[in-house]
Design a protein with these regions (language model features):
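A short, N-terminal "cap"/entry segment at the start of jelly-roll beta-barrel domains
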Residues: 1-38, 81
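Beta-sandwich/jelly-roll carbohydrate-recognition scaffolds of carbohydrate-active enzymes
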Residues: 33-37, 59, 71-73, 89-90
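Conserved short histidine dyad/triad with adjacent acidic residue
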Residues: 39-55, 99
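Histidine-centered metal-chelating micro-motifs
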Residues: 49, 95, 100-111, 129
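Short, conserved beta-strand element in jelly-roll/cupin
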Residues: 55-70
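Short acidic-glycine-tyrosine-enriched beta hairpin
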Residues: 72-105
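A short hydrophobic beta-strand segment most commonly corresponding to one strand
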Residues: 112-131
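Mixed-charge, glycine-accented linear interaction segment located at domain edges/termini
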Residues: 136, 142-152, 158
Length: 160
């Protein structure tokens, strides 16, 4: 069956650009420009780096195999982010999130400490905004930073 989607496959690499992070098969449209949604099959290979991020579109997922811990913001009474908390989502879980919802994913591990891939059916809505990360800033707390700036700054940090 995967041969049916071989020309609809995209491998997304981790933030360093070196390690395959996610394999995405486009079930519906591979190249959508103005269509309001898309449906893909995801195989998550490694955990996100442990930094809260949002997405450019609202999204939904149904976990088919495996699962993950989803880390979401822990907020102070005033509403600002002070850390994160986590919840397990396993096979059969169906969830929907807004583009502004922050999270990061942590895959389960086997007895040898290797991450167990997670398969999910994924829905992404129309692009609503740019996406980014919550960055911890000394003496300030957390602030949202655009993904391009975050990734550029991160590459500089990796070289030092």
């Amino acid at each position: 069956m995967m041969d049916l989607f071989k020309n609809r496959k995209r491998t997304i690499y981790d933030r360093t650009g070196k390690i395959p992070y996610l394999v995405r098969w486009y079930i519906f449209l591979k190249d959508r420009k103005s269509f309001p949604f898309n449906v893909t099959l995801h195989k998550i290979l490694v955990s996100d780096e442990p930094v809260l991020h949002d997405h450019p579109w609202s999204w939904g997922t149904m976990i088919l195999k495996g699962g993950y811990w989803e880390h979401t913001p822990l907020r102070a009474e005033e509403g600002h982010v002070v850390g994160s908390t986590k919840k397990w989502w396993g096979p059969g879980t169906v969830r929907f999130r807004k583009a502004d919802d922050l999270h990061w994913l942590e895959l389960a591990k086997d007895k040898d400490g290797n991450e167990i891939p997670c398969w999910s059916l994924f829905y992404m809505g129309k692009k609503a905004k740019d996406w980014g990360f919550m960055q911890q800033v000394k003496d300030i707390g957390y602030r949202w930073i655009h993904n391009e700036k975050y990734l550029k700054d991160r590459k500089v940090d990796e070289r030092t």
